[in-house]
Amino acid sequence: IMEFYDSIGVPRDVGSRPTTDHYAIRGLLSVHWLFDDDHDDAYFAGEDMSDPAMPGFAYYGNANGYDIWENQYYIPMGFSYDYYITRSEYNALNEGSENAIGDRELAMLRAIVIEDDRVQYYEGILEHLPESMRSFTENGYLQDCLDRRERSCSSFTYTNTGFTAQIDSTQEQIIFFSVPYEAGWSAAVNGEPVAIEKVNVGFMAVVVPEGDSVTIEFTYRTPGLALGFGITLVSLALLVAYLMLMNRVRPRPA
């Protein structure tokens, strides 16, 4: 995830706090609600609440000392793409800075970023983003959000070991989840194990077949946990055996 933030010019430390200039992050990461403290003068939409600092947000109400804003272009977790760009093409785009959005961030709502050596794998699943579609604007971002929402999961549920999602898939396609890619994750589609792809500079995706109510399940297990548990059991068994042996060979008092 640090690689992702670095790639779009957002400083990454103990907590990630992208400025409102980076509005496209909110779309990519499926942000639905924003809570703005009504006790300070750092207004999200100005004192008269008429000019939201990010496009697509509308005032919803106030509760417990917070003004609540809804992202009307919210994309549910788990959505698909029609197009891709390679990591090299992504790196060639404008990065942006801490207080300015760049083309890289906007591009990820229009085309999924795949590693250069995976292009052949996606033949027949994704199309290469045409040059004519490589102009990125605020209005274009809003339309891209609507397009992604059109092909998003119908349900997404966290579990004790990860999450599950369902989608009505009209064709074989790749489904993106804004969950950091790391060792320990495994995935299954309709109960069958599938490979997890690293996409969008550090997030996860899987390819799903055509079908109604396709079920996607991600499970996380701490890497090395089973091995560590096994080593602990073996060590304990050796300790018990050693103590029993020492007890047998210890000379008895006369």
Where does each model-flagged region fall?
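Extracytoplasmic
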Residues: 1-147, 170, 180, 192
